[in-house]
Amino acid sequence: MKYSVQHGLPDRDRVRVCVEKAYGAYEERLSDYKPKLDWEAEDRATIAFTVMSQSITAVVEFNEEELRIDGKVPFLFKPFQAKIESVLGSEMEKWLEKARNGEI
């Protein structure tokens, strides 16, 4: 699973806030799946959750211009990969747009 977008934000701190807000939007709804966000560096985090004993992980990385999400979808969930990418992408876009508009 791959997703990338030009974030259009002036600094990495605001991009990080967007990642945290997007994660937070799903954390409560997906609480049964034990969601987890781990920051490995200032510009790199791993998001993981477990569904039907299958682990789904995604690495979120960003630089001055671009935000990228690269994840592993277990074989069992391959038919849903496009939907997962779409949901992740739209949630990130929503928070990035709010940040660009000065709402967060």
Please annotate each region the language model reported.
Residues 77-104:
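A conserved amphipathic terminal alpha-helix motif
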Residues 49-53, 72-77:
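Secondary-structure transition/turn motif
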